Amino acid sequence: MVNAQPCNVLMVCSRFEAETFWSFKKTSAAVGAKHTSPPLGLITVAALLPPAWSVRLVDRNIEELTDDDLDWADLVFTGGMLSQGADALDIVDLCRARGKPVAIGGPGITSSPHACPAANFRVLGEAEGVIDQFIEAWEAGEREGVFEAEKFKVDVTKTPIPRFDLLKFDDYLHVGVQFSRGCPFTCEFCDIIELYGRVPRAKTNPQMLAELEELYRLGYRGHIDFVDDNLIGNKKAVKAFLPELAKWLEAHDYPFEFTTEASINLADDHELLMLMNRANFVGVFVGIESPDPATLVAMRKKQNTRRNIAESIHTIYAAGLFVHAGFIIGFDSETQSAADAMVELIEEAAIPVCMVGLLYALPNTQLTRRLEKEGRLHPPHERKDRHGIVGADQCTLGLNFETLRPREEVLADYVHILKRVYDPAAYAGRLLRLAKLLANCSRRQPSRRSAGKREMLHRIMANMPEPRELFGRTLTQCAASNPAAARRILILMTLYMDLGPFSRDVIAHIENMIAELAPGAIEPRAHLERASSTLAM
């Protein structure tokens, strides 16, 4: 690598084609951003390249890929998650048409390695495990190849600081960093343990603080998301890191606040919750999936059983962290009471933001292997028109298998949940209850956006969906009941600018699917298989 010849590398982040639950386009626009977060994977790969190689980044979620960009490049890197698959294929085709060698990598192609034969190079698995081989092959003049990393063997303590200097910070709601990879649990539907293993590998404390120092040096201030799939998967490591993070924050006058994802057993560890509080963590995503213990056991998510889930969420609130939660409908063991039980849990726990989706059998998971063995998995179909499914995401692409309950019953339950959970009054009510439950919120808040707070508040309220008066009144009541939590309540309220309209779009889409299941309608499986082909990439 030391003697590598100069090479112009164009990193192209593929576009999330569909409107997804996490798009938050209206929220981003309200605060002057264009997209939620930058491509941490690509800028990490950029840091692994030889110093002699020049690197540029084009994120198609915020800007267009131009002819000048491609003219400059000697080599193009692209890829991403399954939901970016259609655009990644378009990028590969464009590069091949322009005679530009292109490499594709990331979790999408790793899960479905045969999905993109047109790419010159396919990089499968964690890039650190094969990047030296790739560079050597390129330097030797090779222009085709497949490079596959040995699973779960990458030493993340040797991963360099991502190339944060390639980012345009103001274009994003927040930036991401990663402390660890892997999760110790065995959820049947999850692909994380297939991609990164069940033994979480963590970076060192100095290494992680160096990444934050670089962001600070580059002038970034504000929200940072730890993108770990389970930050507390290695409790020993994270408990050693958080006190050091708290010291760093104090020494730098609290430039950042953090969110992350963690398993619900976080609520069982008061010490860990207080460490996160002192390290300026303000929110956490928790996968709840189902309120039914039998369903949780069947999906191998036993960590969510033997507990009162609402009380566990309230314990996290008491430590000053709000909770976003994930729920899934469509499991084999569900009963006709599944929908009402899910809504009741969401209301009792007072979780405003709930990602409720249809079960989808992701490539290379325990669930997919079981359904395939049982003869219930719908076969993937190659989609010739890649843009024919714009607007579909995990909320509408699910159930790519034969359900045990009648399909129309599962879909009707899904509509019922979304209508109740994202009714404006219900959402506002959960905000009010959350404001009373959030404690320990009196912490330093970083300032980032140039627009004045009053101006931003007016912009947000002007863009809230109807009934605006309800949300204005709710914000006033929340601020009166818990002034220290008012800013966080405002953030969660702002998200309804996207979640309200998005839920109504999903409801309309699912109701059309139910109509197609009526006697004399077209075969429903064909509809779902056309949609599922995007995720099969």
Segments predicted by a language model, with ranges:
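Structural detector of well-ordered beta-strand residues that form the stable sheet scaffold
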Residues: A103, V123, V146-E148, T259, ...
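Flexible glycine/acidic-rich beta-alpha junction loops that bind and position SAM and/or redox cofactors
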Residues: F16-W22, S111-H114, F185, K235-K236, ...
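Conserved beta-strand positions
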Residues: M11, T78, F226-D228, V286, ...
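Structural recognition of alpha->loop->beta junctions
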Residues: H114-Q133, L275-G283, V343-V356
